[in-house]
Amino acid sequence: MNNHSKRIDGGLLRGLSVWVKIFQGMQLEKQMSEIERETMDYDVVIVGAGPAGLSAAIRLKQLDSELDIVVLEKGSEVGAHILSGAVLDPSGLVRLFPDWKARNAPLTVPVKEDNFYVLGEAGQIRLPNALMPPLMNNHGNYIVSMGNVCRWLAEQAEALGVEIFAGMACSELVYGAQGELRGVVAGEFGKSGDGSISEAYEPGMELLGKYVFLSEGVRGSLSKQVIEKYDLAAGCDVPKFGLGMKEIWEVDPERHNEGEVTHSLGWPLGFKNSGGSFIYHLDNNQVYVGYIVDLNYRNPYLSPYMEFQRFKHHPKVAKLLKGGKRIAYGARAVTKGGAQSLPKVAFPGGALLGCSAGLVNLPRIK
């Protein structure tokens, strides 16, 4: 067979492959159009039981106790997908529950010491607090487990009559006749990687609402669809993201300083790549150790994970962790675009909440 024949055969095969994919797509579309799902109607459907979604549900119930509100959480329980040992400014919580202390909110470790360092490979320079912007002052804040805070918020929401369904991943959006968002498909199982339906397929159900709030967190799959469909990012800067890695350590009691908050920049990233670290001393000899690397680095060989490992070998950090035990770890994307990257949050039938809308106050690191 000559080269000309090979090219013809290759082109024929590619053409057949395209037609097969088109046919498969048509068959899949037909299958999906024939699926019948049960529906449940609410006044408000909220996707995501993070702090934004739960706070929205609570505030709506406080304003009108007759509203039917459901919160859908993909994790096995509320807080299962929350990855943030955080310093919490309680001002937002005060607006929801002025009596949060009497309600035993899990804010038990006030910030007692606030440090900021510029690191070199073998040493560090502490920046005086007086030189730091007021927004970075953590006086009056608390070191918390956001997972515990979300579980507590869920308890308060349920006490007000909010329905919370855990283990309910939302896979699809439901639109109304006028193009408005009407609801979501939740609890769908048994789709293969190419979208085809397996024998174990469960269609899930449609949860419909007069309003649908998306609080999925950073780069949520449904939020991205809504931003594109309604052109919510028109006129905005391109959003920026970082990769945040966090570990929980149990350290030697002699090295533990409950209430201490430390942030740093510099080594190992240097100043050509942006990012930095945090170390928060919780109670029970536990310490949150984390590192954030902005994902705009130009060096293709840079590994955020390895930069985090190098950071832990800095003399100051290694001394803290010596003899300690890592008890949990994880990583998560972080929105870092700033106000100029915020999309419009309202759209026909709903709104974006929290990190789905990029609502992170970077100067506050909150």
Language-model-derived ranges and their functions:
Residues 26-41, 195-204:
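A short, basic/flexible loop-to-alpha-helix module at the beginning of a structural domain
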Residues 44-70:
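N-terminal Rossmann-like FAD-binding beta1-loop-alpha1 element of flavoenzymes
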Residues 16, 21-27:
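Short, positively charged and aromatic/hydrophobic N-terminal segments
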Residues 74-123:
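N-terminal FAD cofactor-binding segment of flavoenzymes
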Residues 273, 299, 304-366:
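FAD/FMN-dependent oxidoreductases across multiple families
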Residues 156-316:
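Predominantly flavin-linked oxidoreductase catalytic cores and closely associated redox partners
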Residues 136-155, 165, 298-303:
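Short beta-strand to alpha-helix junction loop
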Residues 52, 77, 219:
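Conserved Rossmann-like nucleotide-cofactor binding loop
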